[in-house]
Amino acid sequence: MWFTKSSKDVLKEMNVSEKTGLSTEEVKKRLEKYGPNKLKGKPKKSLLQLFLAQLQDMLIYVLIGAAVINIIAHGKDGIADALIILAVVLINAVVGVVQESKAEKALEALQQMTTPKSLVRRNGEVIEVNSEELVPGDILVIDAGRYIPADVRLIESANLQIEESALTGESVPSEKDANFITTDAKIPIGDKENMAFMSTMATYGRGEGVVVETGMNTEIGKIAQILDEDNNTLTPLQVKLEELGKILGYGALAICGIIFVIGLIQGREAVDMFMTAISLAVAAIPEGLVAIVAIVLSLGVKTMSRKNAIVRKLPAVETLGAVNIVCSDKTGTLTQNKMTVVKTYTLDNLRDISSQDGQKANVDETELIRSFVLCSDASVENGQDIGDPTEVALIVLGNKFDLEKNALNTKYKRVSENPFDSDRKLMSTLNEEGGKYRVHTKGAIDNILTRANKILVNGEILPLTEEEKNKILKVAEEMSDDALRVLGVAFKDVDSQILPEEMEKDLVVVGIVGMIDPPRTEVKDSIVEAKNAGITPIMITGDHKNTAVAIAKELGIATDISQSLTGAEIDEIPDDKFAKEVNKYRVFARVSPEHKVKIVKAFKEQGNIVSMTGDGVNDAPSLKFADIGVAMGITGTDVSKGASDMILTDDNFTTIIHAIEEGRNIFNNIKKTIIFLLSCNLGEVLCVFIATLFGWAIPLVATQLLWVNLITDTLPAISLGMDPGDKEVMTRKPRNPKESFFSEGAGMRSIVGGVLIGVLTLVAFYLGIIHSGTVPISAVKDSNPATREILTYGRTMAFIVLTFSQLFYSLSMRNSKKTIFEIGFFGNKFLIGSIIIGIVLQIGLTSIPSIAQMFKVTAIDPSHWGMVIGLSLVPFVVNEIIKVISRRRND
């Protein structure tokens, strides 16, 4: 009952000092004893379970039934066909297991990458660790925006509020008090004011606590609630494909049924027609589409993670390709987030700050720097910056003037605070020295001046005049014009401790500092690339308009200050008017989280697909409202990461543009895979359907159709999904999110390709039959023993042409506009490998007598190989010619 004990007793029981925390050696011992700090998820399926799951499909049941019927009808002669059918079923199942295992591993890797980090004190230093590495006894540092990674007994709290809906169902945050103790052992979780629980979230204030329970021993672990998102749901694209597959499937089944009936009317053998119809259905129904898309998406996610973009939700990969508005924070995303104070200003005293240590300050400058340092939560320990970069810059400024943070904190102990929030744009602390109290306030200078009535001048506190206010604001504006970030500071002395809401009244303004945060060198090129791709970059920042516009001009985002608006100006514009005019603005400055939502909403109302970046607790609404919410991996809070679709591990704008490029290529790869598969399926159906209508023998037997389906589905199709992508994809406009798979002539290409493959397979069948020159094709039947060898030869020709034409045709599918000679034959090594494997397997299948007999094929005359290859190349050549003609027409 940790909540019934004092913090001192808990620390003693845990054998840990709150000032030093655990040692590295002790952490190792406790990690071995208690295990990793994580909840046990759903048990993983075994390989056998995955394998059996692949067999639970209606088409598989039909195939197995067909194999059994074949043995019953044909006895020993049907065993070979049955074995091939079962082999195809098993191979498909194995491929399915491999696909699902890969997807599962990709998701596990993704979850590992997005595991929250925690701030802990170990060996006397505050460090960031993976939350799974926490152990009982760790001293946890809590601040707004972080998830609570374990059950914690609070030992210090400052206006701390924690949202505990995961445990209590209450969305209103609970106020926490480290000094609270109760003897009531049955007190509800929501009333345990001195405790913080795993999977809850700090929304305000800060605190420290000692970890008392981890993993399954936590409150959330006891009720075995698995909070991880269900990543197994289908994406919108996969849902569309499933629907498309059903429509095509019903169509294919109808055609197969017609073929079966026509065959019976023509007096063909019922069992053979049944086998052909079933095999054709399996070959024609694109049941592999959804699985292939899942593989392409997961491979895309893996590629993006290597480029510093972690995709949390698979639908984001699809949406990325349609993004045309990228709203980005300035600090850290467009800039380097390496803040350095380069100027200070106290009344009538503007000073440049050098990089040297040991600098001297006058009385006002000393007060300015001391107040800034005391009113900061960041620290610099052993050369490691911990905390907000702006605050780190203030700590470094203090170090340059021998006003070191730890020494100041010891002398002027912090008693309470009013944490920063994005509405006030201020932070205040109350510090004590020898029974006296002083409030230190830092933040936006205009907000400070509205709360100040005095000013520090040469160590004296004097009334603040309008003239002095204007002087300060003028210097602040000049700093902003020089692209400096401006921060003001003030203080006031009080006789006793006061409430946080009383801190920011009647302040004594001291001065301002100007910080530089240089633009990222690579961002300028990325903005040019974005504009060429039809993407409009938008800067959204809390900084002053002048600072924001100066950076925006340098980066090429804006050309004039008329393209900018402040939050206050947005408030003056009616919502409907703002939505109509929003497209003309490029910079939004001094905005609150509410403004961000309003901006995203306005852009979306104009039909834009919007990406929005964010890092703070209050950014969650705008991240969720955007089509793509992008959280910062370095500076972002756990709350913003939880609300996002994608996390940037390097907080870099360029990464967003790379992710959009990858998203476009992934969608294009999926599209070309779909068109290729449908062309192949259409060719197979047409070939058998036309032959049946003509009264010819069926050109392809069941086992051959299944073999073709296996080759084309699992090799070239997946390889097309792994295509490196079009180098010119970022020179085109974003796609319309409502765009069909069959847009831009893709549907016609699919039909033309399918018709060519089907007709050429029939031509090969016909040529193979008539090569003997003695029997008309109408006389060649399965039931006629005299023509069986001729029929086998014709089927072999058709079989090879069907397979080869699909393999060659896949090369032409890599780009819908450029020929293979322009993009290069060997750009996709996986596809080349798939084609070579397919050709080798096909030649082996027809050349090895025992295998050839099973598939009812035979070796063909060497003189006919030229004919076979020539016919097989026709769909590829025609598609390449169509590209050239289409491009000339468009030009």
Residue ranges and their predicted role:
Residues 1-734, 739-742, 755, 799, ...:
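Conserved cytosolic headpiece of P-type ATPases
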